[in-house]
Amino acid sequence: MAQESSKIGALRGKRVLLVVTGGIAAYKALELIRLLRKAGAEVRCVLTRGGAEFVTPLSLQALSGDKVYSDLFSLTDESEMGHIELSRAADLVVVAPASADFLAKMAHGRADDLAATVLLATDKDTLAAPAMNVRMWQHPATQANLATLR
């Protein structure tokens, strides 16, 4: 219990950039934000178009206490907090859930949206929590992408 408590305490004051991608598990990002905030972390969210099919920016904003970023080409977002600044301002980047599609983007360096561009621009530790159907998980393409990312 003490070891778990010290791990949670390690998040106090840390800035976590949470990337929420498309998949039914996106709703779990809401609980993750709550737990990170409870541990004392600051949370800023990037929501992909697919992620927005499952959770709303308002829900993420209400729990994180910060604006939600989603559009790579928004003049407002770029002037306030571009993809470079989003990646620099974080101590840790977490992709949860990480859909099969987003894992492929990460593995192949595709930068066609804000979330993928942020990941290419970051030099911070990045954690991905894959979430998909078991057949998608077992597919050779997904396994190859995971091997590339490891």
Question: Which residues make up each language-model segment?
Answer:
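A cross-family phosphate/adenosyl-ligand binding-site feature
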Residues: 1-128, 133-150
